[in-house]
UniProtKB/Swiss-Prot annotation:
The gene coding this protein: ZFP1
Biological classification of the source: Eukaryota, Metazoa, Chordata, Craniata, Vertebrata
Family to which the UniProt record says this protein belongs: Belongs to the krueppel C2H2-type zinc-finger protein family.
Span list, region Does not affect nuclear localization pattern: 171-404
Protein name per the record: Zinc finger protein 1 homolog
Subcellular location: Nucleus
Organism listed in the record: Pongo abelii (Sumatran orangutan)
């Protein structure tokens, strides 16, 4: 096939993000994007994608002059007139530039270029203008400075002022790109990162540094993103809404878990009782009911718990921390859920209704107790005489009869 036909530009294989969309990507998503874009760029270099400009067959100007003429922006402004917009020679050792940020478009300014795999061989010299390499890949220019030129040929590269420099245009071998992807190494654990900022963030795992503080409760975080998520507890913001039922959540992860309920996806099954769960950690926590394991222990009173969250709540008994305050009466509570229930004493709200008799209650737990009147359930049995009760408090009162205490 003629190489001037069926040409491929980088635009055909890239994905664009707006600045707002880019900022919303988490570090792992940005790394994935970077890897894919570099992979595509490398692949384009390994196939015949060169596009010739027939008009340049008749153009015999100096290559540098031609470069200044044909390295143009989409609005046809010569690159020299754009100054700092071009930026700098990009160095993959220190940075990665999103392939959408610099909207350059440039065409080949030489005669028809015969693709040759030897272009990727840095040990081979090339003669004359046929070796001037200017690959058309659309949206970004990636350059790598080389210490030496080949066969006296001058290769064009542009700095902030748009001046031509005597360096070879960036033609990367696939492996070389891979080596440059993660140049930042953690001195504690040797883990490698693509960005210096990710390395700095990672090191906080080792140092324990938590530079981001909540201005409401003074809790600190190692990452700014975690602080932003935490602050939704105070603001009540729930930006993630279920399209099925409209229920909103503070975190996207909670929405994903919730949506599994609609899809009835509960892939994790308990081998003891057959109960299924949407997440593996839920199964792990549930299995402690069967094993009796309580791995979370209070360092104040040695009480143990199935869940870490229950331990955290319990520890507030010892610290006396009650950060949730009622705006009506000033009473404070350890948990936000306790405050919500308390507020119903002021509003009179009773959202839990008995399906048998229509009686309403302010708390779900009270409704459960009430339902035992209709079902006749009495789960609390006296070990001495076998008498059963619907409430634990009534069993406790009854047991005093056996030990001789006055009720």
């Amino acid at each position: 096939m003629n190489k001037s036909q069926g040409s491929v530009s980088f635009t055909d294989v890239t994905v664009d993000f707006t600045q707002e969309e880019w900022e919303q990507l988490d570090p792992s998503q940005r790394i994935l994007y970077m890897d894919v874009m570099l992979e595509n760029y490398s692949n384009l270099l390994s196939v015949e994608v060169w596009k010739a400009d027939d008009q340049m067959e008749r153009d015999h100007r100096n290559p540098d002059e031609q470069a200044r003429q044909f390295l143009i922006l989409k609005n046809q402004t010569p690159i020299e007139e754009r100054g700092d917009l071009f930026g700098r020679a990009l160095n993959l050792n220190t940075d990665f530039v999103s392939l959408r940020q610099v909207p350059y478009k440039y065409d080949l300014y030489e005669k028809t270029l015969k693709y040759n795999s030897d272009l990727l061989n840095s040990n081979r010299s090339y003669a004359g203008k046929q070796t001037d390499e200017c690959n058309e890949f659309g949206k970004a220019l990636l350059y790598l400075k080389q210490e030496k030129t080949h066969g006296g040929v001058e290769y064009s590269e542009y700095n902030k002022g748009g001046k031509a420099l005597s360096h070879k245009a960036a033609i990367f071998k696939h492996q070389k790109i891979k080596n440059l992807v993660q140049p930042f190494i953690c001195t504690y654990c040797d883990k490698a990162f693509s960005f210096k900022s990710l390395l700095i963030s990672h090191k906080r795992i080792h140092t324990g540094e938590k530079p981001y503080e909540c201005n409401v409760c003074k809790k600190t975080f190692s990452h700014k993103a975690n602080l932003i998520k935490h602050q939704r507890i105070h603001t009540g913001e729930k930006p993630f809404e279920c399209p099925e039922c409209g229920k909103a959540f503070t975190h996207q992860s909670n929405l994903i878990v919730h949506q599994r309920a609609h899809m009835e996806k509960k892939p994790y099954e308990c081998s003891e009782c057959g109960k299924t769960f949407a997440q593996k950690f839920e199964l792990t926590t549930h299995q402690r009911i069967h094993t009796g394991e309580r791995p979370y222990e209070c360092n104040e009173c040695a009480k143990t718990f199935f869940k870490k969250s229950n331990l955290i709540i319990h520890q507030k008994i010892h610290t006396g921390e009650k950060r949730y305050e009622c705006s009506e009466c000033g009473k404070s509570f350890i948990q936000n859920s306790q405050l919500i229930i308390h507020m119903r004493t002021h509003t009179g709200e009773k959202p839990y209704e008995c399906t048998e008799c229509g009686k309403t209650f302010s708390q779900r737990s009270t409704l459960r107790l009430h339902l035992r009147i209709h079902t006749g359930e009495k789960p609390y049995e006296c070990s001495e005489c076998g008498k059963a009760f619907s409430r634990k408090s009534r069993l406790s009162v009854h047991q005093r009869v056996h030990i001789g205490e006055k009720p």
